[in-house]
Amino acid sequence: MEAKHLTMGCCYLSRRLNQLSSHDPLWKRHCKKYWLISDEEKIRRNQSWKAIFVSTYSDLGRYIQYYATLKKAWDDLEKYLGQRCPRMIGSLKESVQEEDLDAVEAQIGCKLPDDYRCSFRIHNGQKLVVPGLMGSMALSNHYRSEDLLDIDTAAGGFQQRLGLKQCLPLTFCIHTGLSQYMALESVEGRNKYEIFYQCPDQMARNPSAIDMFITGTSYLEWFTSYVNKVVTGGYPIIRDQIFRYVHDKECVATTGDITVSVSTSFLPELSSVHPPHYFFTYRIRIEMSKDALPEKACQLDSRYWRITNAKGDVEEVQGPGVVGEFPIISPGRVYEYTSCTTFSTTSGYMEGYYTFHCLYYKEKFFNVTIPRFHMVCPTFKVSTARMETNHNEYAVDEDEDSTDTDEYEDRRRVMDIPAPSGRCPHHT
């Protein structure tokens, strides 16, 4: 009798579980949580929530822990670009299928991480065009714009040579040849799935001695952190491009009616670890309040810099104007310019002031504070080839900090900018 009751109870429980599992509203939450399916999309697909979840899971189930995060990042990025850089949207490629990703794994002989695969199930990178999705940087004689590579182009650039063994390029700049790579195996001192800019050891005679500036610990972290900076306004949009200048909100100084703010960027393609030569560019914005009186209009005459490296060494620099110009600032007007500097230490900071004269009272001069702004190079790893090689095999080459940023920039106009595998230009 007890066995009969137990059997009947199990049957009832099974029927109840079956009824619950078919209750469509229960599947709605999972569809929205894991696949970001909207009510509008459900109507368009004309399927039940359960059917949508099951069909999507059968296709993308292996990515369930990544899909919602990456899909939201892509959706946010597309929405933002549609408003701020619409022409960039046209360079994005449609998604690839599982068999395409499997074929690439077979071609390169390495497994791709699931977060990377998941992203390419949403968008297959972009066309090799300018501007690049992964950000730009420009100086008077130097331009970088990184495209997010599609899966086939990335596979074609897969590296097996010493120094970059089993590394897959994620980005590429057609102007500089610069790429960010992802390590598909833990070899040559790299962690698996670590992302980095290559930086040849210029003091080594061994071409496999390649140092690395680290930009991410996984594809998910690398891509979503970049997108977050873009869509929250962390990177400025200049001439319909994403420029990778970082602005510290504390780095603002107001003197009277004039406000000065600074954003900075590290340029890995013009930097090296050996010898220590770290190249930074900075963008300065000078603005006069729109509420200032007309007679407050003034002209910039000169600049003064106090430059301090990580060792505490201080250098003072003075010069006329900025980047060869003597801008006039009037109520509501903004003036922006870009310049650069180098350090032989991994970090440093600059501060100073501009000297202006009033246009209405030509004998009246005053100083405007430039806030202190810090420049720090990314975390880097030294090539294992260096650690394994006799120090006698390394050349001796000393580098110095730049002495005057504007003059340094002028001198660089007559230099050829090398590809990442070349030798970084030095200040002389």
Residue ranges: model-predicted function:
Residues A3, C10-L13, Q19-L178:
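A surface-exposed partner-binding patch
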Residues R239-T281:
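Low-complexity, acidic Ser/Thr/Pro/Gly-rich terminal tails and inter-domain linkers that flank the onset
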Residues F280-M288:
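Short, well-ordered beta-strand segments enriched in hydrophobic/aromatic residues
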Residues T341-R386:
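Terminal connector regions
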